[in-house]
Structures are given as C-alpha cells and as structure tokens.
C-alpha cells in the first residue's frame, strides 16, 4: 500500500496525457 495506487503504469508514464487519473514520476517506480 502507498502512493503507488495513484500512479499510472510505467507504460503510460511515457505520455502523461494518457494517465490523468494518476501520477508518473520516479517515486511511482517509473524512469520518467
């Protein structure tokens, strides 16, 4: 449990517009 519940899949992190309901950042486990 944690903030990752609001994070988008790393595949979606490539285009933030594809995941408005979550976040795309390093703390989400993504490289972008």
Curated annotation (Swiss-Prot):
Record-level GO cellular component terms? extracellular region; nematocyst
> What InterPro entries is this protein classified in?
Neurotoxin_3_Actiniidae (IPR016330), Neurotoxin_3_Anemonia (IPR012509)
**Pfam families cross-referenced by the UniProt entry:** ATX_III
Establish whether keyword Disulfide bond is in the entry.
yes
Grouped into one coarse class, the protein's main location is secreted
What is known about its processing and modification?
Contains 4 disulfide bonds.
List the GO molecular function terms.
Answer: sodium channel inhibitor activity; toxin activity
Q: Which of UniProt's keywords are assigned here?
A: Disulfide bond, Ion channel impairing toxin, Nematocyst, Neurotoxin, Secreted, Toxin, Voltage-gated sodium channel impairing toxin
Q: List the disulfide bonds.
A: none
Q: Which family does it belong to?
A: Belongs to the sea anemone short toxin (type III) family.
The task this protein performs is described as: Binds specifically to sodium channels (Nav) of the axonal membrane of crayfish and prolongs the falling phase of the action potential. It also increases the maximum rates of rise of both action potential and resting potential. Is only active on crustaceans.
This protein is called what?
Delta-actitoxin-Eqd1a
């Amino acid at each position: 449990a944690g903030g990752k519940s609001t994070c988008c899949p790393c595949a979606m992190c490539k285009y933030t517009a594809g995941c408005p309901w979550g976040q795309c950042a390093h703390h989400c486990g993504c490289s972008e």
